[in-house]
Amino acid sequence: MERSKVMILRAKIPATAFLPLFTFALAMWLAGCGGATTASTPSPSPTPTPTPTPTDPDQRADSLIAQMTQQEMLQLVHGDLPFTSPVGPRNTSGWVPGLPGLEIPDLLYADGPAGVGDQVGPATALPSTLASAASWDLTEAYKYGQVIGLEESAFGINVYLGGNVNLTGREPRDGRTFETTGEDPFLAGEINAQHLLGVQDQNVIAGVKHYAFNDQETGRLLANALIDERSARESDLLAFEVSLKGSNAQMVMCAGNLVNGTYNCQNNHLLNDVLKGSMGFDGFVLSDWYSTESSVPSALGGLDQEQPYGYYFDGIWEYEQSNGTWAAESLEQALANGDMPVSRLDNMVHRVLRGMCVAGVMDTPVDVHPINAAADAAIAQEAEEQGAVLLKNAGGQLPLNPSAAQSIAVIGSHADVGVLSGGGSAQVTPYGGSALTLPPDCPPNSSFPGGAACTWSSQIYDPSPPLAAIKAIAPKATVTYDDGTDPDAAAALAATSTVAIVFESDWESEGMDRVDLSFPSAQDALVAAVAAANPHTVVVLENGGAHVMPWLANVSAVLEAWYPGQKGGTAIANLLFGAVNPSGKLPITFPASVSQLPRPVIPIPTSTTEAFNVDYTIEGFNVGYKWYEAQNLQPLFAFGYGLSYTTFSITNPQVTPDSPPSNGFQVSFNVTNTGNQAGAEVAQVYLGLPSGIGEPPMRLVGWSKVLLQPGAQQAVTVTVDATSSSHPLSYWSTSTNGWVVAPGDYTVYVGNSSDNVKPAGTFHVG
């Protein structure tokens, strides 16, 4: 399903009223990528006519390279420590010095999956990226990315290190699940593409990470992902392809792990054959921090720019522990020795410069100014309201009546001060300051070798307390808070209350994986005690990914709020009291137990230096819901699942194949709001490929989110194009080394979750 880019929703803030805090060297005099020419200075004597700046990004990059010395070229292919930057914020992730003589600006990098990261400055803390994916709304996803791009630009940042599209279904305990866009390559890729478009439209280079199969934090720099070619192409690599082709993002970050025995950042097959070859990526590949292992093999393997803590390209830190010698040669030495052709350096620099031009970095003067905090916070609230998922609502417990004179117990998870956020490089310093900062809660597996320490991050609560928001939206209610540390006291309060709202949370972060799928710190026992005291118990979850819920049968309602962001408390109150009708759908599967996972125990390293295998051939391309379907397992909550305060029906499906059918099809159906409240339904289209080729039972190929008033009906048509970047009708053939549409019968399914679909029709490819 191809979708056009949505319109820019808010213009970039003008800076005429603000003094710039720093500038990129001479950037304001750069000529435009779109065809502007450099003006000549009048002279009393004849002067040559200036050469027009090429309008094509590739031609412009080549023109600059022709004017560069080898040292200048080498300067653009390795980054430096952020605190060595003479310009810009000190707390960036890193920087690459520009070349003022050629009017090439510095590159300043910052993380930002859920807002401007790296403590660059107080920024809007958006809901988690996974919450954005749960909206299943491309317009909302674009607005989400737009906030990040606008704010990174406001801080003088011009390279975005977000865009995490690793598929979470392989390892639901991954500490970075909250940074991702889900388990399905099509949904994850489409949502991520809109994030990237929103960023790059603000003249910030957008990046996709972590390429590839970087699906666990435990021993992440030593993990060797084992995967066959067909499974790789139809799962994780497909998510990257959809993201890149849907966004024109100009940077890909290679990860620190190995794939089939070769480190990602020197993996010729993944970088040159797949990414730059069959996917047609023409931007630059940048290493994750600590993720290079060589100089020449990395450069020849497809790495274009090395970032700090590697220092192989410039020959500074290539210390070989085995014999105590400085072993690896720098790129400068390799060029002199003939170990690397000059043409490869030319290509590396070309890709960096091309990316700068395409994204508008080359022609955008630094414009440092305050962020538009109020407008961006409103988008953060909207993103949470669209992405929260109603998991249970027995007896219509929700929405609560905001006008009732009732007693409400609010219990647990510091709901009196704020809402929890995720940690690591994705951590945002929230605008207005942290409401509460606690030490990191690192599980035992975070201390394994070959990983990143989780101790450098803290538990930060964004300043939007649900308690205050509940009091504001229900002024006639008596609202009482209990911190939940004593289950008996919490149960006693619940027993005397009309309704009990328990907040249950789990801090997740880069540098660690969860040891299981349970909530920590006896919170499950707290919920059980409260539910035993009051049958009208509502649970609100603040967490990064899937969890088990042993108390589920005994509570009346469950709202998955994810990490809800800067305005999370207000959004949660609006959802609980019906000011907003929940419409989110799960972008991941919630397992019933760890025993259902392909690897019930997370693989761990046994050495500080030796790689260890993580066997992804177990599930292959059957990631997430495809695994549960293939294994006939019933999860706790299925992919695509989510309730509403109203009800819907999907009727009268009709499938119309293209001519020939191998080109794709259209499926039409009616969506009706059969309840008494306005609400939105996400109608999902899945496709089953012909039997006998070994594909999953079905795959997501399209969807439509429809907002309807009570009793209203809308005719919907979803078009599935076989030539789109998700290859919806194809499988990867290892014999032809390409995508193939197999002959046979194709079955189209329509429904509102992966476990609630019905056949809509079939068509035959002859």
Residue ranges and their predicted role:
Residues 40-734, 738-740, 745-754:
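Glycoside hydrolase catalytic-domain context in secreted enzymes
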Residues 756-766:
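Short beta-strand elements
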